[in-house]
């Protein structure tokens, strides 16, 4: 599943922002607009026992150019909340449910 970082209109958002995947399905986050973005999973908003640091980009790592990607595969079922560290305050937050 591909998730865009930033809307075509320049909005600071994940597109789609709320989605479901099967356990083990690869999710690819792709910078759509050329603003610096990243993908960090909220350690308090993921299934118990999952290590947020193993599925997240480091807060200081950024996808700077349009077309740059970060991929992750989630195997534990449940709901995961993630955000873009530079734009979390602007509401750039998303949620994925793993079935």
UniProtKB/Swiss-Prot annotation:
**Do you know which InterPro entries this protein is assigned to?**
BlueCu_1, BlueCu_1_BS, Copper_blue_Plastocyanin, Cupredoxin, Plastocyanin
Q: Where in the cell is it found?
A: Plastid, Chloroplast thylakoid membrane
- Any one Pfam family match given in the protein's UniProt record, by short name: Copper-bind
Name where it mostly resides. Answer: plastid
Q: Which UniProt keywords apply?
A: Chloroplast, Copper, Electron transport, Membrane, Metal-binding, Plastid, Thylakoid, Transport
Q: How does it sit in the membrane?
A: Peripheral membrane protein
One GO cellular component assignment for this chain's record is: chloroplast thylakoid membrane
What residue stretches are annotated with the Plastocyanin-like domain?
1-99
Q: Which cofactor does it need?
A: Cu(2+)
Q: Which GO terms describe its molecular function?
A: copper ion binding; electron transfer activity
Name the residues that bind Cu cation. 37, 84, 87, 92
Which top-level group of life is the source organism from? Eukaryota
Q: Can you tell me which family this protein belongs to?
A: Belongs to the plastocyanin family.
The task this protein performs is described as: Participates in electron transfer between P700 and the cytochrome b6-f complex in photosystem I.
Q: What is the protein's given name?
A: Plastocyanin
Write down the species: Solanum tuberosum (Potato)
């Amino acid at each position: 599943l591909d998730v865009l970082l930033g809307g075509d209109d320049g909005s600071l958002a994940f597109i789609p922002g709320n989605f479901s995947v099967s356990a083990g399905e690869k999710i690819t986050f792709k910078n759509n607009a050329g603003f610096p973005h990243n993908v960090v999973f909220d350690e308090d908003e993921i299934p118990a026992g999952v290590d947020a640091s193993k599925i997240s980009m480091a807060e200081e790592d950024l996808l700077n150019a349009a077309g740059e990607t970060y991929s992750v595969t989630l195997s534990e079922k449940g709901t995961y909340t993630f955000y873009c560290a530079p734009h979390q305050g602007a509401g750039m937050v998303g949620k994925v449910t793993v079935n």
